[in-house]
């Protein structure tokens, strides 16, 4: 499947009225209107985001007391499965590749219905003061609590009931994402049949090549991870090895495309997810994320070079409208824009990655700001690039002055993004076929890396729900009661994937329209939990209060509008719309109830807890951690195991 077909599937999930119209339907570029140069906007955005990272990000790290001398959970609690210390770039690559899914491209371009200026402003302001703070905060709070997940933090600071409700929400959230992204990724690789039902090689070549590369990715990643551990490949050696392997995989994939239908690829993706979700993280997920990040960095570089080259040719003018009004065909700017943009500015899903997997890999506490805050800033830059590419292509997609789409031109977010970057790559000499295959692979990678992260998070959420312990290291080692079976990584992964597989064949479409609101509700619950964490540990948390208030108001407004819309639809359509509007109504009401319960409990804790009443947890150690940490490091660390200090 080409990037255009992939985007068509993606837009089918959006569930908003704008998803059933051309992206820029109703938007016109008026004669005499001044236009922004894409190169200028790109440079300004890069400077603003870099300043945010160097200024606000580092200030926040100092404010919260990041300690580069402290031994992290990844080192102290290394267990050969979930806790695995990694270099700063490796940990960054895991975080970045896991969070940078479809959102920063799809959400930003869809939101351009309100004009490119409000979207850019929200991406920059939201990325620096909301999203990056959210991601870094979740990562840091987890690290200061022995790698606890967000649900376990809620248990500690708010209560066991809040934890159970949150875990149920997370697991159901993961099922929806697994279903949607499995459908999208499989559709990306699926072959296109001709009239007789045979493979149409001309139309299926790029998808087949990308499929081959993706299959090779899994096996090469495991070999790469083994080689890095065996031969101690770090820094430049590790990066160069990764680049060489990527080039080799790409060359092989171009020569040996694999042609399977949609169901065949769904089976392949599901088998991969079983291993990605259950295997020790350093064996598959960690090295695959490293290689994926190399590819995504190359994509970003290609996008930047393409915009610069087009700018040199006078073809980088953003012709899309700067502002179209506070109300468009897709609804009111508040809350639609802020719910739609999601990953480009803030996404609640990121907190599950930060606290669920990344906190167990960061080797040095000082790297937390690079991994948590830095990855989000880079993702915001990807969102800005998507806006620029779409803005430049606006005049090509629309018949001048009419807002009607020209025939045969990309008209969906990923198609716009992929086509625009491919054009830019051709502008500086890359072969068109190579550019198409490269972008097809990137389009699928954006979804696949988030998909395997969700599979792993869904598995851990399932196990944590039944666990009696609130200890991150003890959950999978708990062998009492149902945890003898449900605590097993392979069992929990399969149990999580089976309902996701069932939903893949259409059921998820009925509730997908609420994904944006549920994602931001998760972000709001994360931020308010972080506010409680800061107060309980005596840290300054005032910078979280405004984001918390904004997110909760925005989310509940969006859900309230959805509930009203569902009620109206049910009154008009009756039983005929029960499977869609009825299910959405039930899900929306449950989300509101869950959000209110968690928010009210958090507010009670904020008002009732004394500052500094619950200091950071005493460091925990695993047997592997004891062996691997040097006697000097352990003796110098606060809470070093008894006997180790004496040995030093």
Q: Residue locations for each model-derived region?
A:
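A generic transmembrane alpha-helix motif of multi-pass inner-membrane proteins
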Residues: 36-52, 245-282, 286-292, 302-309, ...
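Loop-to-transmembrane helix boundary motifs in multi-pass membrane proteins
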Residues: 160-175, 374-380, 435, 464-506, ...
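Flexible loop linkers connecting adjacent transmembrane helices
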Residues: 58-84, 110, 120, 124, ...
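Membrane-interface "cap" regions at the ends of multi-pass membrane proteins
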Residues: 51-105, 293, 332, 336
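Transmembrane helix-loop junctions in multi-pass membrane proteins
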Residues: 37, 104-105, 117, 176-200, ...
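Extracellular/periplasmic helix-exit of transmembrane alpha-helices
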Residues: 307-325, 377-419
């Amino acid at each position: 499947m080409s990037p255009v077909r992939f985007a068509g599937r993606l837009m089918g999930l959006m569930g908003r009225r704008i998803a059933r119209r051309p992206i820029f339907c109703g938007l016109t570029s008026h004669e005499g209107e001044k236009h922004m140069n894409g190169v200028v906007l790109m440079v300004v955005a890069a400077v603003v985001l870099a300043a945010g990272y160097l200024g606000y990000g580092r200030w926040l790290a100092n404010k919260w007391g990041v300690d580069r001398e402290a031994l992290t959970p990844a080192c102290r609690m290394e267990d050969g499965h979930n806790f695995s210390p990694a270099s700063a770039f490796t940990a960054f690559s895991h975080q970045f590749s896991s969070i940078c899914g479809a959102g920063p491209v799809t959400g930003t371009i869809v939101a351009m219905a309100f004009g490119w200026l409000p979207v850019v402003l929200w991406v920059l302001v939201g990325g620096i003061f909301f999203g990056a703070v959210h991601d870094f905060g979740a990562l840091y709070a987890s690290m200061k609590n022995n790698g606890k997940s967000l649900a376990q933090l809620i248990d500690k600071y708010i209560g066991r009931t809040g934890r159970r409700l949150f875990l149920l929400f997370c697991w159901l959230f993961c099922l929806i994402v697994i279903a949607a992204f499995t459908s999208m990724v499989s559709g990306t690789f699926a072959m296109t049949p001709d009239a007789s039902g045979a493979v149409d090689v001309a139309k299926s070549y790029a998808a087949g090549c990308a499929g081959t590369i993706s299959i090779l990715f899994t096996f090469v990643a495991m070999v790469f991870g083994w080689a890095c551990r065996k031969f101690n490949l770090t820094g430049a050696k590790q990066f160069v090895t990764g680049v060489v392997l990527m080039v080799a995989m790409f060359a092989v994939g171009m020569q040996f495309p694999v042609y399977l239908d949609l169901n065949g690829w769904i089976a392949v993706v599901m088998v991969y997810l079983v291993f990605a979700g259950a295997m020790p993280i350093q064996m598959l997920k960690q090295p695959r994320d490293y290689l994926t990040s190399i590819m995504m960095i190359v994509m970003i570089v290609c996008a930047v070079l393409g915009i610069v080259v087009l700018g040199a040719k006078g073809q980088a003018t953003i012709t899309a409208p700067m502002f179209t009004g506070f109300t468009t065909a897709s609804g009111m700017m508040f809350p639609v824009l802020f719910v739609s943009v999601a990953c480009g500015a803030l996404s609640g899903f990121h907190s599950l990655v930060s606290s669920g997997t990344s906190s167990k890999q960061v080797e040095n506490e000082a790297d937390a700001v690079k991994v948590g805050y830095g990855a989000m800033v880079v993702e915001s830059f990807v969102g800005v690039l998507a806006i620029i590419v779409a803005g430049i292509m606006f005049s090509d997609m629309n018949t001048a002055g009419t807002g009607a789409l020209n025939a045969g031109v990309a008209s969906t977010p990923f198609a716009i993004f992929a086509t625009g970057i491919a054009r830019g790559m051709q502008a500086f000499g890359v072969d068109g076929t190579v550019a198409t295959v490269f972008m097809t692979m990137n389009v699928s990678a954006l979804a696949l890396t988030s998909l395997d992260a969700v599979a792993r998070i869904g598995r851990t959420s399932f196990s944590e729900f039944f666990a009696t312990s609130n200890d991150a290291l003890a959950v999978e080692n708990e062998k009492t009661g149902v945890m003898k079976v449900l605590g097993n990584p392979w069992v929990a992964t399969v149990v999580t994937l089976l309902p996701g597989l069932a939903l893949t064949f259409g059921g998820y479409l009925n509730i997908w329209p609420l994904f944006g609101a549920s994602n931001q509700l998760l972000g709001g619950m994360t931020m308010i939990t972080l506010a409680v964490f800061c107060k309980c540990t005596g840290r300054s948390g005032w910078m979280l209060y405004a984001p918390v208030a904004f997110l909760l108001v925005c989310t509940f407004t969006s859900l309230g509008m959805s509930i009203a819309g569902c009620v109206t639809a049910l009154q008009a359509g009756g039983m005929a719309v029960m499977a869609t509007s009825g299910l959405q109504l039930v899900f929306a009401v449950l989300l509101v109830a869950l959000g209110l319960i968690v928010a009210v409990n958090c507010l009670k804790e904020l008002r009732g807890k004394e500052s500094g009443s619950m200091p950071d947890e005493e460091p925990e150690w695993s047997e592997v951690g004891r062996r691997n940490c040097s006697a000097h490091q352990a003796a110098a660390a606060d809470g070093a195991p008894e006997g180790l200090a004496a040995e030093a």
